[in-house]
Amino acid sequence: MVPLWLLLLFHVIHFSHGNEIDSAASNGSALSYHYGKLYLPDDHIPYYLHSNRHIAALCRRDPHCPFKQHLQNLNSCWGYEKSCTKGHGYSYPVCDQVDFGWAKTIEESQEVFWKQADFGYVKERLAETQILCRPQEQGDSMLACSRNLQHCRATNLYLDLRNPRRGQENFKEDFLQEGEIGGRCNLDKQALLSQGAWKSPLQSWFAELQSYSSLTFKPVEDAHCDIIIDKPTYFMKLDAGVNMYHHFCDFVNLYITQHVNNSFSTDINIVMWTTSVYGYGDLFSDTWKAFTDYDITHLKAYDNKRVCFKDAVFALLPRMRYGLFYNTPLISNCHGSGLFRAFSQHVLHRLNITQQLPKEAKIRITILVRSTEFRKILNLDELVHALEAEPTFQVKVVDYKYRVLGFLEQLEITHNSDIFIGMHGAGLTHLLFLPDWAVVFELYNCEDERCYLDLARLRGIRYMTWENRDKVFPQDKGHHPNLGEHPKFTNYAFDVEEFLRLVRQAAKNVSRHSKWPFRRTRDEL
C-alpha cells in the first residue's frame, strides 16, 4: 500500500485539480470549459500534455477537444520531467566558447547554463524537495520544502493571526510564534531548523516557517478555522513594485513556481506576505492577470482570524542566492534560456499582446527616454533626426510614464519593436518581451556592464552597448548624494555618426535573424 503522505505529496506536486477533470469527463460542456481555462500559448500545449497524461487521455476520447493536433507530440517535454528523453526538450542553450572558470567543454558549458538559468533549474528544485512534516492519516497536514526553504508546499495549513504583530517592517522575523502556524502531522523539527543558513527576507521562507508546529488537532476537520480557503493559494514576498527589474524577479519566480507545481491555473489566490501595516505600490499590476483571476490579497486581510488553507505554496523568492534573476551567477559565453523565452510567451499570451507587423519591411526602432533627473540623452533630437533620415527605419520615441502610458500599452510597443534603445535603467527590463529577432541596445551602461547584458542572454536576444568611450560625452562626473562622483547620476550626449553605425549594425542583425518575418523578401538593408 502506498503511504498516505506519498499520496498527499503527489497531490500537492500535481496542483492541477484532478477532481475537476474527472467530473468533467461525463459532461461535455464542462470538459470544453476546462480546456478553455488552460489558456496556454499554442506552442506550450504539448509540453503541458506530456506532464498531464490524464488530460491527454480525455482529449483523445473527446471529439470536441481543441488540442487534437498536439496529441502527436506527447514526447515534447520542458526538460525537467523524469519522463523527458534527450532531444525532446523545449530548447537547449547555445554556448559560443568555453568559460574555463565553470566548464571544460562546450557541452559542459551548456549543461551549466541549463542548470543555472533554464529548465534544469526547475529540475534541481524538484529533486531537492523533502518532506518536513508527514501526515499519518486522512485529513492530516503536510509540509514539503526545497533546500533552505526557498520553496514550500503545504496541505491543511493552519495560520493563527489573532494576535498580529504588525509594524513598519515588511518582513518581521518574529511575526509568528509557536502554535500560530502549522498542521497536524509528524514534524521533523531538527530537519526544519537545519534549513536556516540562507535566512533573509527575500531569499528564504525560514523566518516564516521556523515556528511551524505539529498540532494536536486537524485544522479543517476539527473546526479550528474562522476562514477556510479551498482554492490553491500562493504566498509571495514581493520586491519593489515600482521598479520593473526588481518586480519582474517576482513574476519570473512565480512562473518557475508554477512549473515546480505543474499547474498554470489562474483559479488561484495569491497572498502578498508582508508584516507591514502599509499597502504595496505596484506599477505593473496588470501582469497579475497572467497568473490569477482575482485581486492580490494582502496578508493583513486575515488579521484577527484563524485561517486554514487546504492547499498552499510558498513561492520561489526574488532575491534568492543562486536564484533568478537578481542573484544569478551566470556562466559567460552562453545564451538562450528556454525558461525565460517560455515566460515571455506565457505572459504575452495571457495579456493578449500580439505581434503587429508593418506592411513594409522596415526596422521598427523604439527609443526609451527617461523623465528622471539623470541618464537623459542630451542630444536626443539630433539622434532621432539622423535615424529618420534612413528610409528603412521606422522610429518611435517613448517615455514609459505609468500615469501617461499603461503597462499593457507599454508591452504592446515593446513587443512590436525590432530594435529597443535606452539608457541603463529598469525600463530595459522590457527586453524580456521583445520578439526573438530583436536587438536591445543599452545606449550607455554607466559602467554597470553585466546587468542587462545577462538579462538579454537569459531572454536569448542580441545585446549591444556603446563601444567607443571617446565618443560619449557626460554632462559632468555625476553627483550621487552619498557616494559622490558616479556615472549613473549624470546625463549624456553621443556622437551621431557612431550612434548610426551601431544602429545600422543592430539592423543587420535583425534582418539576418532566421525568425525575422521579412527575411526571405529582403536581401539587404
From Swiss-Prot:
Reactions accelerated catalytically: L-seryl-[protein] + UDP-N-acetyl-alpha-D-glucosamine = 3-O-(N-acetyl-beta-D-glucosaminyl)-L-seryl-[protein] + UDP + H(+); L-threonyl-[protein] + UDP-N-acetyl-alpha-D-glucosamine = 3-O-(N-acetyl-beta-D-glucosaminyl)-L-threonyl-[protein] + UDP + H(+)
Major localization listed first in the record, in broad terms: endoplasmic reticulum
EC numbers for this chain: 2.4.1.255
GO MF annotation terms: protein O-acetylglucosaminyltransferase activity
Region forming the signal peptide: 1-18
Protein name as catalogued: EGF domain-specific O-linked N-acetylglucosamine transferase
Role this protein plays: Catalyzes the transfer of a single N-acetylglucosamine from UDP-GlcNAc to a serine or threonine residue in extracellular proteins resulting in their modification with a beta-linked N-acetylglucosamine (O-GlcNAc). Specifically glycosylates the Thr residue located between the fifth and sixth conserved cysteines of folded EGF-like domains.
Motif (Required for optimal activity): 293-295
Family the entry assigns: Belongs to the glycosyltransferase 61 family.
Residues bearing glycans: 352
Keywords (A to Z) from UniProt: Endoplasmic reticulum, Glycoprotein, Glycosyltransferase, Signal, Transferase
Enzyme kind, highest EC tier: transferase
Compartments in which it is found: Endoplasmic reticulum lumen
Keyword Signal appears in the UniProt entry: yes
GO biological processes: protein O-linked glycosylation
Annotated gene: eogt
Listed InterPro entries: Glyco_transf_61_cat (IPR049625), Glycosyltransferase_61 (IPR007657)
GO cellular component: endoplasmic reticulum lumen
Motif mapping: Prevents secretion from ER: 522-525
Domain of life: Eukaryota
